[in-house]
Amino acid sequence: MTNTKYYPDVSANVDFAAIEREILKFWQNNNIFQKSIDHRDGESEFIFYDGPPFANGLPHYGHLLTGFIKDVYARYQTVKGKKVERRFGWDCHGLPAEMQSEKELGISGRLAITNFGIEKFNNHCRASVMQYASEWKQYVTRQARWVAFDNAYKTMDKNFMESVLWAFKELYNKGLLYESMRVMPYSWACETPLSNFETRLDNSYRERTDKAITVSFMLNDITLFNSMISQKLGMTGGDNFKEYRILAWTTTPWTLPANLALAVGSDIDYALVNKNDVCYIIAASSVAKYAKELGLSGKENFEIIKGLKLQGLSYKPLFNYFENHPNSFKIFASNFVVEGEGTGIVHMAPGFGEDDQILCESKGIELVCPVDNSGKFTKEIPDLEGVQVFDANDKIIIKLKEQGNWIKTEQYIHNYPHCWRTDTPLIYKAVPSWYVRVTQFKDRMVELNQQINWIPHNVKDNLFGKWLENARDWSISRNRFWGTPLPVWKSDDPKYPRIDVYGSIEEIEQDFGVKINDLHRPFIDELTRTNPDDPTGKSIMRRIDDVFDCWFESGSMPYGQAHYPFENKKWFVEHFPADFIVEYSSQTRGWFYTLIVLSTALFDRPPFLNCICHGVILDATGQKLSKRLNNYADPLELFDRYGSDALRVTMLSSNVVKGQELLIDKDGKMIFDTLRLFIKPIWNAYHFFTIYANADALKGTLNFTSQNVLDIYILSKLKIAVNKIEESLDNFDTQTAYHAVSEFFEVLNNWYIRRSRARFWKKEKDTDKQNAYNTLYSCLETMTIAMSALVPMISEAIYQGLHNTAITQLNCLLLEGKHVVQNPMSGTQDYNTSVHLCNYPTLSDFEINHELVSTMDNVLDICSNSLFIRSTKNIRVRQPLACITIISKHNNNLKDFEDLIKDEINVKTVIYRDDLENYAHKKLSLNFAILGKRLPHKMKAIIDASKKGEWETSTLGLVICGEILNSNEYKLVLEPHSHIKGTANFENNSSLLILDLELTSELIEEGYARDIIRFIQHARKEADFSITDKILIEIISEFDLSKIIENYGDFIKEQTLGEFAKNFMPDYVSKVALENNLIQLKVKRL
């Protein structure tokens, strides 16, 4: 026996995490990532934008999921021949960095930061934003994601910031920017406004209970209604009401001190309710809710008037804080007032409500906003100065009760927006801000969105499309510190107004005569100059305090990373838009949105052409992953336990890539199952090949010419799988791609290898044996390349092993790190050190034998169904059965594989029939969910008819109760006649098999012989014998086995490479049970 080995010694029980660590070393030592880019120089590019994360926190499972998806398509496009640059990037500015710094410095609020010093604060932010960069690199590298960290862009870099300035000025020059004091979502905890889309990020709405109150406002003019309605209302004590009071309902009592108007619905019916000669005005539909407060019995009749008649009436202010405010304290009609909750009357505080501001401005009422940046009342409300608005509610309610304006207090449960950084409830507050006129070009955004391929596809017109249709102007300025400063300088003297907007560092340097080394505050704030429009020379141009919304910077990533237009103009034109981006679904309100806003406004182009919106990862109970809940494991721990390929497969083969949720358990059972059910079968096929190829001292080659029917079948299945993976990944569908891999290895292991064992085991090294090795080798090498993006490290390990590189020595390759391998795509010699440097296989010289595949798949179906019947009847596979009857219209094809069927399911005879009607009938199975929606009124009759078999098929389809059913509304299921046992359907429910389950004594004896063979093979394995070792066997039994040995002894010896003997010193002894009888088995290696 030769000692020549062409392949590593591969263990069946392998530590995949250890293998991955070796692969990572191999990639690093051989610079494989950079080679994968360099060797595609001159090829067309696949443009990929890497959305920048913040580096002031550790990566979580969501980051890993996004990273896995990015890596799959980058690797895939590389093996498809594209050049794929993968430049990493960091988000550096904004609230995440500032909040972290405030926490670390022990300060809070704008005043505290100013006192601390803006320069020192921003220096701390600059240092803190990158504090986890090394950990990020560790996580990203360990997950086998290839990115260029060394050339990473940062939004805090001067060049990136300058591109942001350019974008701002471009928008300004196009008339797409304006400054305004508008009501916006406002985080009092962060002391900054938020964009409307930021309140939609990460499900920032929380259930909250607030006090909703109803208050009465006294009308000033009480004569309007008296003469008209006093008699109808049955008043007492005279012909006049003493007072008219209009009732308003609000969930924000703290806004009442800033009330300046009331709004009613023009067409809403309002009831005039008499209580003790006071007329209360309330929507007629809401009267019943206030019966107790208004002393009503439910039998009263009310005078009804339309809301339009109330317009223009004035009322007495609840408080005297703004009693002299011009044009205020009147009732106005508006179409945003609706019936339902409350009283049908809305109180207007234009400083705290967007609709309020719009209505009041249209009536000449200037807003008031007596709340400061930290959400506390200012001195304009002296009774509440310094009180946080939510803490003021009870104080306001008490005062209203004392004044006689209070009617009712309720506990109101509603979904309320919270700050996405601090999780504190937002308020709506008027703040000065710069806005992008998104409403001016939103229709164009909707048009450009149609050019984007969204995954899932419904995002285009639903989640994202509807968001674009309702887009609002975007507030892009923030009164914060750590960010790109708005390049706007204003005159400090309103008598000589002037605004200068700068779009480059050069422009700033020219006007201010200084060298700009840092664009951040406070350095940029210190740049001042005399106002050129002031003839007195006294007014000064000063920069406004605001910085950019960090989302503006994220949306500037395509040109910011290139320092466009100051550098790399040609590069940018060639790399815009992106071919592909990916993030989780909430980014339709974040990065995806800001990208398309700026891309449309600046370039009139979509920013990307393909976009995956994946779902979110939750714990096993459906809760968000949280450090506080301790409901997830550190990803690095899972990598060390199961490897990162297993986590990659777990995530990307699930519905999370289609925008749905993925529930993952803390202990990693789901990942272990992936390892066991997906990755281990791949390794098992590789292990089988190496162990037998080494035993035979044979080397496999890429060869697709074998005429063996099993070889042709598995090579056809291989090409089908390779094509399916390619089609799936071309369509950004990893789920289907992983299924194609799993399905192929299921057939390879459990059909091809098992059915070809005799070819691998036989002694002769003939052409048939070599063809078997070549075929299995071709399957393994081709699939490692095809699936290299899906399981990059296991693919690399197998690929290297197939090229005679020991797994533990991957970082010690010879020939200057290169191996000569055959490329299955071209048939030429390529110098590839890695599977990731190969070209995607096409198998262009091999034609799929579709007829063989169809027939063999039916054979496989017959065998698997037969084995299932055995399992359900508790008949072991080693027990022979008399026959199987196959009832099909395609028996002629099946007859060619009769011996295979007999051997696989262990039967003596195969009987073929085509008279299906004598064995089974068609049963109608209805799809109630679909059919019930179309024909709800006929469902009972259709169900009854289906049970009675009162239906028929025609050229038009299936007809029942006079209705023609659609193909997705029913199935015709083959159902055996009740007296027939041991049956199963196959060939898409059009054929039937019947397994004869009766056991004769001869069949039972042969079954025992096969059991003995299994016991001996198990003993060989436990004794650690080689598969080629010949052995001695002795069997000592409690019952007589002589007849079995006499009839099947030669068969037993052939299958086990053994000879029967007695009185020898065994290497291994075992005791086993055969049909409840004890057998002692002794074996010895010869």
Curated annotation (Swiss-Prot):
It catalyses: tRNA(Ile) + L-isoleucine + ATP = L-isoleucyl-tRNA(Ile) + AMP + diphosphate. One of its GO terms (biological process) is isoleucyl-tRNA aminoacylation. It comes from Rickettsia typhi (strain ATCC VR-144 / Wilmington). A motif ('HIGH' region) lies at residues 53-63. GO terms for molecular function: aminoacyl-tRNA deacylase activity; ATP binding; isoleucine-tRNA ligase activity; tRNA binding; zinc ion binding. Monomer. Belongs to the class-I aminoacyl-tRNA synthetase family. IleS type 2 subfamily. Its cofactor is Zn(2+). GO terms for cellular component: cytoplasm. HAMAP family: Ile_tRNA_synth_type2. InterPro entries: aa-tRNA-synth_I_CS, aa-tRNA-synth_Ia, Anticodon_Ile_ABEc, Ile-tRNA-ligase, Ile-tRNA-ligase_type2, M/V/L/I-tRNA-synth_anticd-bd, Rossmann-like_a/b/a_fold, tRNAsynth_Ia_anticodon-bd. Disulfide bonds: none annotated. ATP binds at residue 627. PANTHER family: ISOLEUCINE--TRNA LIGASE, CYTOPLASMIC (PTHR42780:SF1), SOLEUCYL-TRNA SYNTHETASE (PTHR42780). Keywords: Aminoacyl-tRNA synthetase, ATP-binding, Cytoplasm, Ligase, Metal-binding, Nucleotide-binding, Protein biosynthesis, Zinc. Pfam families: Anticodon_1, DUF5915, tRNA-synt_1. It comes from the Bacteria. It is found in: Cytoplasm. The gene is ileS. Gene3D superfamilies: HUPs, Isoleucyl-tRNA Synthetase, Domain 1. Catalyzes the attachment of isoleucine to tRNA(Ile). As IleRS can inadvertently accommodate and process structurally similar amino acids such as valine, to avoid such errors it has two additional distinct tRNA(Ile)-dependent editing activities. One activity is designated as 'pretransfer' editing and involves the hydrolysis of activated Val-AMP. The other activity is designated 'posttransfer' editing and involves deacylation of mischarged Val-tRNA(Ile). A motif ('KMSKS' region) lies at residues 624-628. This is Isoleucine--tRNA ligase. Its main location: cytoplasm. IleRS has two distinct active sites: one for aminoacylation and one for editing. The misactivated valine is translocated from the active site to the editing site, which sterically excludes the correctly activated isoleucine. The single editing site contains two valyl binding pockets, one specific for each substrate (Val-AMP or Val-tRNA(Ile)).
